[in-house]
Amino acid sequence: MFIIASEQTRELDRLQKYLDKLGQPYRVFVTNLETDLDQQTESLATFFTQKDPVSKIGKPLFFNDLAVPELWECWTLGITTYLFDGEERRANVVLREDILSRTVERVEWFGQREEIVSIDVYNRYGWRSKQSLLTEAGQSYLDIYLNRQQEEVLLHFVSQGTFLLQTPKGRDRLYANKKELQRAVLEQVLPEDEAVLLMDKALLDVVKEKPKERLAYCASDAHDLDEIKEQVSQILLVEDGLLREKK
């Protein structure tokens, strides 16, 4: 089964747990740019940056293992962790949800007066998967998506909304917007003969070429499903951890 969602949601989490219990194999594709995903899930960004299976092997980076210049130190005060160059703080180290593990989620680098000028994001496999460059107002103007070798693969020029894919052979490709990028990726990942389960009705448009018999839709409630019924063969309801089929 091939599952398409806009993002990782509670409903998707519940569905995955249910399929795991049944021993039902599945793959998940989320149409956002998340880079911290499990081995069964792919996104618009990881489609380009984590093609090598080795990319999804590893464990979260322990904070003391951060690569920093010689003589720099990683200091911790309670749950606050930062990089210190011997004279001043150079970055905040934000830890992953499991605080006691002391593993890195992101590093917020300082410019002058401890204003954050860039952010490095680390995934669950222990390597830097994204870098965001920030304006003086603290907004990202360029998001850089990296592979495990730390090569810049996909660039997102945030204010323009454009994407630049950089390939090893130098055949770079420009995408005018996220919708164009999404269309190009889904053309490659949508299976020919596998059942497709949609988690967001906004995604119905991207699979309109697929036979209705191969499409299903997963909803969190039974409201406003009449139009969707005409486009898919089955509708599944995920309600408070229960999964049932709606005829």
Question: Could you describe each region identified by the protein language model?
Answer:
Residues 1-67, 148-247:
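Long terminal segments
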